[in-house]
Every structure is written in structure tokens, then in C-alpha cells.
Amino acid sequence: MVPISQKIYALDDIWQMDFEKYPLASHYNEYPFLVFENLVSKDECKRALNSLSSCDYKAKLVGSGLDESIRKTIIHTPTKEIKEVFEKAFFKVKEKVEKFYGVSFLKGTELQVLEYKEGGFYKCHADNASEIVKDGKLVGYKVVKPERKLTTLMFLNDDYEGGEVEFCHLRYANGDRVIHKPKAGEMIVFPSHGLFAHEVKPVYGNNRFAVVKWWDVI
């Protein structure tokens, strides 16, 4: 395994693949991604969630044209309240993120609200690239959304079972998988490229709501 931070390693075969791995934080950091806990208050999370349920909000179902064996998610166009909550949270940490990755933010994509209902999941994927598979084996990633360099993911609730984020190609020194259990009000920031391909574990008990925006950087 190859160390990409003080605590996290990349699998050898993935690291050796020839695909874009920009940006990447210094390996002197404890972790190669950032987690900002309690960035959004419980009241703000509640206000954001209520804005989805308090109006005749029509979700854009992700299912038409997509393979539900890979992804079972509902995407909502964000409400005004959700946009306000996200932007306030993001600008609290913007400079820290830029310093951590040695980048400057450019334009971001449109905000998305991701809802995972009972049994909802998302199998391993990279946010800006498609898998290159040969003879049934992953051999690399091809960038298909170059405007996505960094992923900012904010969680609005945690009153459900499952729904963990696992980074498929990363491990701890002892070989354990890198799995993050989301907490309401926190934001996690990580590169959008193939090295940080990740999956969302199946959700049970309650619906899981998260807000995501991808950023181009230089």
C-alpha cells in the first residue's frame, strides 16, 4: 500500500493506474480528506429539511435511464433554504479547504439534494470519472466531468441506519477499510477523482438526506 496521509493508504494496484489524481493533499496530513463536524446547527438542518416537505416539492427521480442495481437515489432541486444553509456552511471552511489542498476554488456545479429512502444505496463510483474495465477487471478511470475536482458533501440528518460512506480504494495501515459514518450538520470534502471512488451503504429505518456540490479548482 502507498501512504497518501499519515493514517490512510491507497491500494497499490489503484495507485499505479494511469489516471488523473489531482488534487491530492500533502501526505503529511493526518487524513487525505476533511471532515468539519457541527458545521450546521440542528435547527438549521431541521429548517432545510422542512423546506423540502412543507411545499409541493417535486423530486427529480433518478431511475429513468439509470441502472438501479448501481444506484438507487432520489435527487431534489434545492430549495432557497437549503441553498442558504449550504452556502453559509461552505464559506466558513472555504479558506481551510483551499489551504489543505493547495488550490483555489473556481466555479461550482448546481447544488443537489440526495435522498436515500429505505434500501437506497450507491455502489462504488468516482464523482468525475467512469470506470475503465477490461476482462471484468478495473484498469483505470476516464474523466468525464472535468469540472468536478473537489466534492463538498453536507449531511442534513443521521437518524437512520446504514448510509456510511466507504472509500473503495483506501485502507488504514492495518488493512481496515476507510468507512465514514455521517453526522447531521457536518461536511466532508474530498477529491472527485478515481482514487477517492466511494460507495454509500444501504440505508434503513429512515430516509437519508445529503447536499452535494462539486467544484472546479486551480
Regions found by a protein language model. Give the residues of each.
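Fe(II)/2-oxoglutarate oxygenase catalytic core
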Residues: 1-190, 194-218
